[in-house]
A protein has these predicted regions:
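Acidic (Asp/Glu-rich) sequence patches and key acidic residues
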Residues: 1-138, 153-154
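C-terminal or internal capping secondary-structure element at the end of a domain, subdomain, or sheet
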Residues: 140-154
Length: 154
């Protein structure tokens, strides 16, 4: 049996640092009409299975296998922010978690042929402004937007 580790690098946030309310989550979701439909279907699917009782619970649950259409290991709040930004800004982010289960959302460099022209031209300030725009909808508290080195393994 072997064990391997992986590292993800990029500029972004620790999603777990965001303290928000259900009303603010719904406000964020409402910005992206296509994602909003998907989000409400996602909630319905969870409720049909008996989980969860509230949006707050949904935001902390690990994503279940049948909902892996976006990315594995994503929890609710990370999925919501990622979905909104991808639809509204056409910027693709990486959601990942570390050994301690803390979730991160990062703008990670990738092969240029996988990046849009918009992504290729983004500066550090552009990425900072992008995260700040969406995080500020969810909370008035400071959330660090910085270079992230996320390590995990399995």
């Amino acid at each position: 049996m072997s064990y391997s580790t992986w590292h993800d690098y990029g500029f972004g946030i620790c999603v777990d640092d965001i303290k928000t309310t259900e009303d603010k989550v719904f406000e964020l979701v409402h910005l992206a009409p296509n994602f909003e439909k998907e989000f409400y279907q996602w909630i319905e699917n969870f409720r049909e299975d008996g989980d969860p009782e509230s949006i707050a619970e949904l935001m902390t649950m690990d994503q279940i296998d049948k909902y892996e259409d976006r990315s594995c290991c994503m929890r609710g709040l990370g999925l919501i922010i990622k979905g909104d930004i991808e639809e509204c800004e056409d910027i693709h982010l990486l959601a990942c978690d570390n050994f301690n289960g803390c979730q991160y959302l990062i703008f990670s460099m990738q092969y240029p042929w996988y990046m849009s022209e918009k992504e290729k031209s983004m500066t550090e300030k552009d990425v900072y402004d992008l995260f700040n725009k969406y995080v500020s909808i969810l909370t008035d508290e400071f959330v660090s937007i910085d270079y992230q080195e996320v390590e995990n393994g399995g």
